[in-house]
Amino acid sequence: MKGRVRIRGIYATALTSIFSSLSYEIVQQSVEISERFMQEINNLSADITIKDFEDDRGKIIVMGNGIIEDDLRNVFKYSFHWRSPVKLYSVIEIDESCTYANFKVEPCLREGIVIKPPYDGKIILSETKAVSKYAIVWRGKGITTFSEHIVDEEEKMRLLTLSLPLNRKGYNVKWRSNAKYVALNELKEDLERLILRYENREFRDQGEDFYLITLSLPDKLYLDEVRKNVVDTVKYHHMLKLSYNREVDSLEKDKKGSLGKLLEGLISDFLKIEHIKADGKVIYLRGGKVIEKEVNDNGYRIVLRREFEGNGILDGIGKKIEEGDYDIVEYNSDKWYQIHKYYSGIDNSLKGVYINISTPPELLRGKIRYLDLEIDIAIRDSEIALLDEDELNKKSIYMPSSLVNKAKEVVNYLINRIQQNKLS
């Protein structure tokens, strides 16, 4: 058996099924999950937590110790994977430039504990503390605090029997959620180890791995299929859950409503475009007016007209953008690319074609989202140009090999279609 995993959030049913099959031990299940899998709740402490990312439920956080990275890359084959170069709760020393491993650090402490890894380019620190999977200890006012997941008053009193004596000696103690699943004698020994670590400044081995996975539409569809083996699940369940809640439940449980209508309800007259880079950076492209749409229970096809002001150069095409120029682009839930056709606002002549290679686009309320696969194709004056191949190689550290191979496969397919004059 591999590590113990606690799973929370909208992907919990599918991920419980998957990680159970990979020989991880599932612990601290919700009542709903235990009933769905006909299991008793396994009240043991967790080594690993998998949950939705609070800032964006289209992403998953995996944190703790004991996860096998290859398992993540084999499960989420077509998603972006970011592993923090600095461990959560590790203690680091900061130089005068207030940076660490080329990341900006806030606040600029000489030494501190990492409380937020740099998934947005910045490390957030707090004062140095000793951390285990059960508790956090540091010198302070001598108080005890509790994880938000410890709410039972009897449980708090149980834990206070251990932390109050330390409070009287000037130590702060914060109990983590795992503590409520562990016997007092084990917790007492853990606190003693934390005190020694804190006083001896032995933080070298402290810290937890932290992964942030940006899910693609194909991987969400895979999770839909896994969930379907456990409970009634419609196609696009996990995508729709980012915009709807009760409507999806009603469709699945009560068979009320239409999947096609839910999908169509996400399409406004004007759609924003969320273009996600492999390193996690999000670029909001100029949105567009919906001029065509086809939607049914199996998928969607949306055509946008994006209009430009007279400023800049068309990327990859090299022609000046003039007032009134516009782009006609199709987003298709089945396609790993979008063909941008740029036209002159003066005489409607075609200026060039730019093909963006990406995961199939998701529909969220009022916007389209996809993962950009870095490599692109431009057609200018009948010449084919392969763009940013070096970027794909450089950013492949964030991609499973299956995703890199898919990007190359799509490029080869498109070049072949262009050469045969069959591009569509």
Swiss-Prot record:
Gene3D superfamilies, alphabetized: FomD-like
Assigned protein family: Belongs to the FAU-1 family.
SUPFAM superfamilies according to UniProt: FomD-like
Pfam family, one: DUF402
GO MF, one annotated term: RNA endonuclease activity, producing 5'-phosphomonoesters
Record-given protein name: Probable ribonuclease FAU-1
GO biological process: rRNA processing
